[in-house]
Amino acid sequence: MRRLLTLTTLLAGVPLAAPVCAEQVFSFQRAAGQLPKTVVPVSYGINISTDIDNLKLTGQETIQVDVRTPTEDVTLNQAGLHLAGAVLDNGVKATITQDDAAETATLHFPAKVSKGAHTLVITYSGPILKTPNGIYVDDYTAPSGETKRMLVTQFEVADARRMFPGWDEPAFKATFQLNVTLPKEAVAVSNMPVTQSTPEGTSQKRVSFATTPRMSTYLLALVAGDMKSVQGQADGTPLAVYAPSGLEEQGEYALHASEKILPYYNNYFGVKYPLPQMDMVAIPGNYQAGAMENWGLLTYIDNVLLFDPPNSTPRTRELIYEVVAHEMAHQWSGDLVTMGWWDNIWLNEGFASWM
């Protein structure tokens, strides 16, 4: 409150060239975007199988949708995926047209889909990338000297469409329940806790995560690999910092920082952090985003999350605290409350930096 009062006082003395106009109250129908708003996702059930050696994924998703205007066509985003089939409700099949330049797919049904709740099942496949966007692999040198491979996602601004077809615009919020098949030795983390892990054949396992709150597609996240963690808690919320095995102890400083920051934000915003956990992950090297505020699974390039006392400088300690505080602020400003379109992302970033 004191910071806001100070800022208001300072601005009161600044001459303005034109009247300041507040934006209108958010309206989903008026929100900017490229997709039609005739069909809106309510929940996604996403099942993906990963082949990280051959860089391929296959998927099937079940999307509960709300048809707001009867239509024969459902248009959603995809980028680099091949949609093999789409079925509505009791087996009504769609004809699929993909526009790779527009990064969309249009599902055409033989008759208008009626207004109300429907179930859409889509089967698809696609690549796992080596570039740090969408779903990709990060090859790095472990402390042991071995070359290791980590599976990582980075969806901001508009790359969730590289892992699953969906309404990949920030205004289209929905819940997500993620299931992923991956190497059995990998530790997998996502926005929510693991609910089940079962063997798949001799070399893989299927990991299921709890359903997220309503959120934008760009905030969904998955990281899997040879990782270990240090753990703590604050205000009743379990906290953890994950790092490549052998480096996990270097996450202690970031963990202690988060234990101080979380109670402060809970009090400052007057809304307690709503997810059942908060995990932070150090991505070794191939992570151009620097840091990302995925709701409940904050990801960082390793040199802004890990602190090695014999080798790190005091400035590194300051940087870690600053970046952790910034990404944690986004759990409210950006994740809980989200801009309707990307032209207001400056407000997300500005507010998190100001905090």
Curated annotation (Swiss-Prot):
It comes from the Bacteria. Substrate binds at E156, G290, A291, M292, E293, N294, E349. Binds 1 zinc ion per subunit. One of its GO terms (biological process) is proteolysis. GO terms for cellular component: cytoplasm; extracellular space; membrane. SUPFAM superfamilies: Leukotriene A4 hydrolase N-terminal domain (SSF63737), Metalloproteases ('zincins'), catalytic domain (SSF55486). Signal peptide: none annotated. PROSITE patterns: ZINC_PROTEASE (PS00142). Keywords: Aminopeptidase, Cytoplasm, Hydrolase, Metal-binding, Metalloprotease, Protease, Zinc. The active site is at E327 (proton acceptor). Zn(2+) binds at H326, H330, E349. It is found in: Cytoplasm. Its main location: cytoplasm. It catalyses: Release of an N-terminal amino acid, Xaa-|-Yaa- from a peptide, amide or arylamide. Xaa is preferably Ala, but may be most amino acids including Pro (slow action). When a terminal hydrophobic residue is followed by a prolyl residue, the two may be released as an intact Xaa-Pro dipeptide. Its EC number is 3.4.11.2. Aminopeptidase N is involved in the degradation of intracellular peptides generated by protein breakdown during normal growth as well as in response to nutrient starvation. Belongs to the peptidase M1 family. This is Aminopeptidase N. It comes from Acetobacter pasteurianus. The gene is pepN.
